[in-house]
Structure formats: C-alpha cells, structure tokens
Amino acid sequence: MKRIYLALCALLLLLGTGSRPAAAYPYYAQMAYDNPREATGKIVCANCHLNAMPARAEVPQAVTPGQVFTIKVGIPYDLSKQQVLADGSKGGLNVGAVVVLPEGFRLATEEEMTEEQRQETAETYITPYSDEKPNILLVGPLPGEQHQEIVFPVVAPDPKEDPSVAFMKYRVYIGANRGRGQINPDGSLSNNNVFRAPATGRLTSIATIESDLSDLPPELAALVPPEYELPGTRVLSFETEGGLKHLVVPPGPELVVNIGDSVQEGDPVTNNPNVGGFGQVERDLVLQNPERVKWLVAFLAAVAITQLLLVLKKKQVELIQAAELLG
C-alpha cells in the first residue's frame, strides 16, 4: 500500500496542472517515514527540498498543564517570484510546515480553543503525523501568498494524568517549506533542478517534443522516461570520446548552452529554476508546575515584605537615635 501511495504522489508532483501553484507536500514525508525527524535531528523534508531558506517560529517560553497555546511558524519568501510547475509553466509557490512537539503535547480541538485561536486557524487544516505520533503536526500545501505565517494550536499535557510527562524544559523542532522539491518521492529528479552535462564533449543537436513523443526520432524517444513525455522536453546529444551521449531535460529549466558549445562533464547546461526551499529551527519550551509558580510568588512576596519591614525598622531606629541626641 505504501508503494502505491508513493507512486501516486510522484505522479501528482510530476504531472501537475497548467496554472496551479507549485506544490509543497509535507505529506510525502508522512507516507515514507515513520518519524519525520532523523536521529541526526534533521527533518526529512530536507532530503527532497535541497535549497536552504529561513524559517521563523514563535513559541511560548513556558506553559502549564492543560493550557491551550499557539506556535506561530513564519515562512518568508519573495512573493514576486514564481517557479516552474511540473509541466514547465510558471506558478506561485505553496507552503507547508512540520512541528515536532515533545511527547504528550497534541493538537488542540476546536472546542478547546478560544475564539481568537479559532480565527487564527480557520483557514488551515492541521493533522497529526500519525495515530502513533499525535505530537507531530503537519499542514500544507497552502497558498503561500495568503500563508506567510501558520498558527498551530497546541494543548500541554498534565503530568498528573500522564506519568511519562515531567515538569521540565523540552525542545520543539519546526520545519517550514515553500515550493516544489528537487527529488521526487520515488527518488527521481523533478524538473525543478539544474541539469548537467553527462560527459565532456560538444553539443551537437537539440531535439524537442513539440506536442507528443512522436516528434522525436525513435532512438531518442526511447530515452525519454514516462514522466518527461511532455511538450517542451528536450533531448541533448553530445559528441564525446566515448561516443554519442544524451541528456533528457524536462520542460521548465532554460538551456544555457547552444549547439556547437563544448562542455566538461558536470557543467550546468540549464539554469537553476528553483526559488523555494526548506528551513528548520529549534525552540525551547518549559512545562511549568503551577504549584511552583505559586510558591515562587509567595517567596517573592515574603522577600518584599521582609525588605519593607527592614526599612521601617531602620527608620524607627533612626528616629530613636535622633530623639536620644536631642534629649
């Protein structure tokens, strides 16, 4: 079943539609990984979205058991930029985010949220990563123009009800993505990549699919993978010492070489169309014991009262000493 899901996801990413925004699907990680955070600490979205871009997060410094609070994830990028879609056309970027909470924390229900929190999350559909990991939250894809910031409503656990939870400082891991990735779920390259020369040599010809695969000579058509059988796909032929080498370039990336140009193996033959990327941040979150807060307030009040009494006592002594001097 997992293989079928991955195949369907790859198909959706590659085919796309003409004017729809480029997709950012954190759900691909959900289908391929039991846990989206690797042992190294890296969130797996970075495995497909290779470009690094900033992510911002606002997390409360401390919360108490049962408190409903919000985590705000900022996904900044230049709204004037567009990137290539799967069919080679240009479109806006979608965004997505992953929040890895400490175990015991979970997504707040609508009934648990305040009216303000309901309004902040009204246009977002947030889901737990899985039944086994309700502390990991996913959202996306969402239109990036309207969702530069995403709000996650969260409920803090109560150690009295869950013995596995303790009053202590925890770590929250947050990943934010914008735009399509460079690696498809099946491991193949998307068209949101730089394509490079397969060998050292000279570019001798460029064959282009104008409408369908029949536009190419049979020997070149056989080289085109199914996901690249689209108008605008090009097959570049290079004359090398080892014979003729070919490179299939899907629609989207723009060629930066011309027929007759000499290239070295690994030289870029297209521009880099990617304008998106993934960012990850970490924040501390303290689960505070309200009893400790009460005792702290009582201690501070006692200190303040003691200081006040000392000041009054000092004034009293000064007055007595002044009276004795006058007497």
Curated annotation (Swiss-Prot):
First and last residue of the signal peptide: 1-24
Cofactor(s) required for function per UniProt: heme
Family annotation (InterPro entries): Cyt-f_TM, Cyt_f, Cyt_f_lg_dom, Cyt_f_lg_dom_sf, Rudment_hybrid_motif
UniProtKB keywords: Electron transport, Heme, Iron, Membrane, Metal-binding, Photosynthesis, Signal, Thylakoid, Transmembrane, Transmembrane helix, Transport
Entry superkingdom: Bacteria
Subcellular location: Cellular thylakoid membrane
Cytoplasm found in the keyword field: no
Biological process according to GO: photosynthesis
Cell membrane among keywords: no
GO MF, one annotated term: heme binding
GO cellular component, one term: plasma membrane-derived thylakoid membrane
Binding note for cofactor: Binds 1 heme group covalently.
SUPFAM superfamilies: Cytochrome f subunit of the cytochrome b6f complex, transmembrane anchor, Cytochrome f, large domain, Rudiment single hybrid motif
Binding site for heme: Y25, C45, C48, H49
Bilayer topology annotation: Single-pass membrane protein
Transmembrane segments: 293-313
HAMAP family: Cytb6_f_cytF (MF_00610)
Similarity annotation: Belongs to the cytochrome f family.
Subunit structure: The 4 large subunits of the cytochrome b6-f complex are cytochrome b6, subunit IV (17 kDa polypeptide, PetD), cytochrome f and the Rieske protein, while the 4 small subunits are PetG, PetL, PetM and PetN. The complex functions as a dimer.
Reported function: Component of the cytochrome b6-f complex, which mediates electron transfer between photosystem II (PSII) and photosystem I (PSI), cyclic electron flow around PSI, and state transitions.
Protein name: Cytochrome f
Upper taxonomic lineage: Bacteria, Bacillati, Cyanobacteriota, Cyanophyceae, Synechococcales
Gene: petA
